[in-house]
């Protein structure tokens, strides 16, 4: 019996090593066949996790989502194997691209919790942040953004994304003071899209609070700084006209609207916002 077992385990290793050699040569299609054959011949084989991992990677290379989901799914049945972090990443990414955000979120949360490197931990948190934002789950967004912002090495782009989504979540939760703190940090750089929108939102917060002087100051400062993101500058011009109406400076309000009407060319909702306000100012 011992001999039979020994022969079988030798056969197991030889079959696996042969498949791995083909893969290492960069021959994905025959390697895929060999790994698949290996798993069929040795279902619980000593190298079955490795084979599932390689089939996952080949599936990703060949843009075969079903293969990635199948083999990553198999790897995830063994929670603490050496491939589980990569499996969570690949599995989560496909679910995210398929707009199955709740399922992707679960993968990213596991990755965030068990990641062995800061980079993987960040990838998990970014996944949770983006899924949470798309699902309008403010608590998930706030937790993930806060975890990201506590990271020692975070790129400026990711810092901005985390601040932006956290600010939006705080606004939804009526946590205006916390939202304002995040928005004001973002608004320091209006060259970025998040910064330009944040600058507008800071002014909007002042306007909604009835603090018209601060709203006016914020917008005039935005006009001075300028931004490549013309839409948010235009929205700020419109907000400035609302501020002037509230301050009973209707003439100024009208002038800003007319100037915007002449200078703003894009085909979006700005024109209708201008017309709606000009109607009321007649």
Model-derived features with residue positions:
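Acidic, polar-rich low-complexity tracts and alpha-helical solenoid repeat scaffolds
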Residues: 2-282
């Amino acid at each position: 019996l011992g001999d039979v077992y020994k022969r079988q385990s030798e056969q197991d290793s030889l079959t696996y090593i042969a498949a791995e050699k083909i893969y290492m040569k960069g021959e994905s299609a025959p390697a895929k066949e060999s790994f698949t054959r290996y798993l069929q011949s040795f279902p619980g084989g000593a190298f079955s996790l490795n084979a599932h991992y390689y089939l996952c990677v080949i599936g990703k290379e060949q843009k075969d989502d079903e293969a990635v989901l199948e083999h990553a799914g198999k790897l995830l049945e063994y929670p603490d194997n050496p491939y589980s972090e990569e499996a969570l990443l690949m599995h989560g990414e496909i679910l995210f691209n398929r707009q199955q955000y709740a399922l992707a979120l679960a993968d990213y949360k596991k990755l965030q919790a068990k990641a062995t490197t800061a980079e993987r931990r960040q990838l998990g948190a970014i996944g949770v942040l983006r899924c949470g934002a798309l699902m309008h789950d403010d608590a998930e967004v706030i937790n993930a953004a806060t975890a990201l912002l506590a990271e020692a090495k975070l790129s400026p782009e990711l810092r901005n994304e985390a601040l932006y989504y956290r600010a939006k979540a705080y606004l939804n939760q009526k946590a205006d003071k916390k939202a304002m703190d995040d928005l004001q940090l973002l608004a320091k750089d209006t060259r970025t899209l998040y910064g330009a929108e944040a600058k507008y939102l800071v002014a909007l917060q002042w306007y909604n609070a009835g603090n018209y002087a601060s709203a006016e100051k914020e917008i005039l400062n935005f006009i001075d700084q300028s931004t490549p993101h013309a839409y948010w500058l235009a929205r700020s011009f419109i907000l400035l006209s609302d501020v002037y109406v509230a301050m009973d400076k209707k003439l100024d309000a009208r002038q800003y609207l007319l100037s915007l009407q002449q200078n703003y060319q894009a085909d979006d909702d700005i024109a209708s916002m201008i017309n709606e306000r000009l109607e009321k100012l007649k």
